[in-house]
UniProtKB/Swiss-Prot annotation:
Span of domain CoA carboxyltransferase N-terminal: 24-289
Reactions mediated catalytically: N(6)-carboxybiotinyl-L-lysyl-[protein] + acetyl-CoA = N(6)-biotinyl-L-lysyl-[protein] + malonyl-CoA
GO molecular function, one term: carboxyl- or carbamoyltransferase activity
Gene: accD
Organism: Beijerinckia indica subsp. indica (strain ATCC 9039 / DSM 1715 / NCIMB 8712)
Taxonomic placement: Bacteria, Pseudomonadati, Pseudomonadota, Alphaproteobacteria, Hyphomicrobiales
Protein name: Acetyl-coenzyme A carboxylase carboxyl transferase subunit beta
């Protein structure tokens, strides 16, 4: 070993080193297919070969949903950040700050208002990347605000659900959001305004036990896991094996819990068609087969 071997290789490695973005290639959890990240983004985060629907953030979802990607963001109310002064391995306030920095959002629900094939609609999107899309005071207030906006604008309300359930760090304050949101669903019904739920992967826990399963029309993305408790918990409780595909969107459709399973690319046309039908508006594009 001499100075040449000590100095030259590091120099060469330094020269050849380049800043390479992580996750250039995304692997399909179902088929193992590798997809270039830009191609996956252009395909709305649906794996081309297998059709597997991966996580999609609220912004690209809304961009693809509304006419020409044009919509108005509806601000969500501020709520007390940490009413219980909760702490586990870290303080709850620190967790919130971490996820706000990670997602660029104040909490797990984003609201927007725009046109679906010319029809007004208020849309809420739950972001599973923000603390598992969990339902706390902020998320509950956001959902309620979206429904209130639909009432004020006399427009259909559409919500894309994705959640692991109630936010444990907020205790009873989190559980209170279940009846509060359910009451607002009833207000939409009394006003004869369409309430359409799009169940995305996963929709579980307290969200599935409240507003997520109360839609006039229940739509689901392919392969989405939908249920209250997890499959393993159910099996351990009843001491029986569950049917294949249990809690998947297609299974729920076959058993009457979901009205239709719709591919992500087809959702704008399908939702516009449903809104037109439920509001007696002029018919637009047909629902894709």
């Amino acid at each position: 070993m001499n100075w040449i071997s000590n100095v030259v290789p590091p120099k060469i490695r330094s020269f050849l080193r380049r800043d390479t973005p992580e996750n250039l290639w995304i692997k399909c959890p179902e088929s193992g297919e590798l997809v270039f990240h830009k191609d996956l983004e252009a395909n709305l985060f649906v794996i081309p070969g297998s059709g597997y629907h991966m996580y999609i953030a609220p912004k690209p979802r809304l961009d693809a949903l509304f006419d020409e990607g044009v919509y108005e963001t509806i601000p969500t109310p501020e709520v007390p950040l940490d009413p219980l002064k909760f702490r586990d391995v870290k303080r709850y306030t620190d967790r919130i700050k971490e996820y706000r920095q990670k997602t660029g959002a104040p909490d797990a629900v984003k609201l927007a208002y725009g046109k679906l094939q010319g029809l007004d609609a208020v849309v809420a999107v739950q972001d599973f990347a923000f603390l598992g899309g969990s339902l706390g005071m902020a998320a509950g207030e956001a959902v309620i605000t979206g429904m209130q906006q639909a009432l004020e604008r006399q427009a259909p309300f559409i919500i894309f659900t994705a959640s692991g359930g109630a936010r444990m760090q907020e205790g009873m304050f989190s559980l209170m959001q279940m009846p509060r949101t359910t009451l607002m669903v009833q207000a939409l019904r009394e006003a004869r305004l369409p309430y359409i739920v799009v169940l995305t992967h996963p929709t579980t826990g307290g969200v599935s036990a409240s507003y997520a399963m109360l839609g006039d029309i229940q739509v689901a993305e392919p392969g989405a896991v939908i249920g209250f408790a997890g499959a393993r918990v159910i099996e351990q409780t009843i001491h029986e094996h569950l049917p294949e595909g249990f809690q998947r969107a297609e299974y729920l459709q076959a058993h009457g819990m979901v009205d239709m399973v719709v591919r992500r690319h087809d959702l704008p046309a399908v939702l516009a068609r449903l809104c037109a039908f439920l509001t007696n508006s002029p018919r637009r594009a047909p629902i894709p087969a």
